[in-house]
Amino acid sequence: MRDSDDVLWNTATLTRLLEEDAVGQLRRRDGKMAELGSENGVLKLDWVEGVARLPADNTLLEEVEEEARELWRSGIRHLIWAGMGGSIITVRVLDELGFCSGDQGIAIYPLDSTDPAALNAIVRRIAQSKQLPLPSTDTTHAFLHTLFDDVMMVGVSMGMTSEEPITHLTWFVELLEQAGITPAEHLLVMTLPGSYLDQFARERQAPSRPLQLDRGTGTGGRMSAPTTRVFLLPAALYLTRENDATGQLRAVLSKAWQYYDLDLATSAPDEHPFVQLAAALYTASVAGACRLLLKMPEGWSALVAWIAQLMEESLGKGGEGVVVFDEQPLQPQAPGFYGDDILHVRVVTGATPQDDAFYTLSLPYLTGQEPHERLAAVAASFLGWQLSMALYGYLHNITFAGQPAVENYKARARALRALPDPLQAVQDWQATVAGEHLTLLAPTDVALHGSPASVFASVLQQFVQDGQERLGYLDFTFNGDVSREASQSVAARWHHIGNERLGVPVKVRVAPADYHSTEQSEMDGPPYLVSLRVLSREHEKSLLGTYSDTFLRAQAVSTWQAMIEQGRTCFLLLIDGSPGQGAHILETFLDEVSYSISKSNQ
């Protein structure tokens, strides 16, 4: 349905939400909303009214501000934030918006990778800030002490089974001990009781703080902002250095709650922008699936990754869900183009000319310039998108709590890490085609005729030519850190293949971070994707301490295996050498894929 039919359907959807009191159910935590918002029978809806509850308490928010001041008074100037998914993506948003730079305060370094290169990059940044040259040979006690005496690592896990922060903390503790620094004074853990990370903290006697200020456990990781310490502590670290007055977090959350206006969503849902958005997504969806192409105002693009995690991890289940992309131009004459489940959303801050190609989401509060206003705007945006997500789940009867599919690859990775080399697990894979300096592992039903590039291109062509299965989008995933230049080069080629040659949107992801944010959807959400995962056979060695690429390799293999088991069209491309050495090989591969498709389209 489109045009006038869409308007009628959208109106009917808003009427349904009002008559069934969907927002009221969410707030009361009852009815179908309680069922959809529960994981293993346990309610995970503390986030719904969390912002209303916190300012009502006289001390909780001020305690977080005092924690921030105490970190400064203790001499901490650099804070490595180690976590995955919802435990860190909010911090990445705040970092990109300028709240973690450490200008006159504590610098925050997000760490969500098992690639030694990510640790090396943080070490280099801290050393550079101190004008401390890295030694070319073995590090000395004095060097490590100077480097780390004002550094703290915060290990965060809002799930029970995340192990990456444990590997980061283990690496850091080893270096602190070599430096003669007491680890307990430079560690902080925030996690759920009984989690893997909690067990680690207890064994190491590391200081810990509850994620929810009220010590509750009813907030899923992707709902961590703005009601848990994942948002509140970085915000407090920034605010208390700008101005030492108390009550700043209270003011930010109160303003965000005012912007959000959940009372309006309850009493008049047809007037609330995020309820309207949920209805529009539902109207655009086909068989429970919707592709959302999102255009943010200047300066706010950092929110897209957060929104993608929220939507895809929450709703990507049973072949349904919302898949989120940056706005990108699709060639309507391309053989794979279709638009009947796409919603182009343009977020605006004020009056703008009508554009029929976009659904317009008006958020005037994004125009604020002062730090308090911008933090409130970020928080209000988080709340609004969470509401849209829950209502879409309600309309399609999707359980939006939990992310069961990803436990498959986590268990596999755990086993693969015990091997001398996790790639041993795929060395005898039959659906393998080798080229010069690269090897492509394919699903078993793929015909292996020609080069790796031609094999991959033929699968894409088959999707758009036989008409039996639609191609909804392409995913490209780097396993491990990659240079900006290589990322941009690959992204340009990938967009050309998807947008121009085939007429479909594309994703460019970096793992393992994105395995904790959008892999749930790729494994169990809308099945109409083709995914290409890339792993270099060699990676940087750790500059300091002991940290190998074994976990990274295990994650690359385990996620691919899990996708294959799930029946998804997923390829693993192994490239000889390091990411830098393999950049040209990868570019050539993608150019050959593009050329093969163009020949087929002629």
What are these regions (language model features)?
Residues 63-77, 125-151, 277-290, 449-474:
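Glycine-rich phosphate/diphosphate-binding loops that line cofactor/substrate pockets in enzymes
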Residues 1-73, 377-382, 387-396, 402-408, ...:
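Extended, charge-enriched "interface" segments that sit outside catalytic cores
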Residues 515, 520-524, 543-556, 561-570, ...:
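Expand to "…catalyze enediolate/carbanion chemistry for C-C bond making/breaking, isomerization
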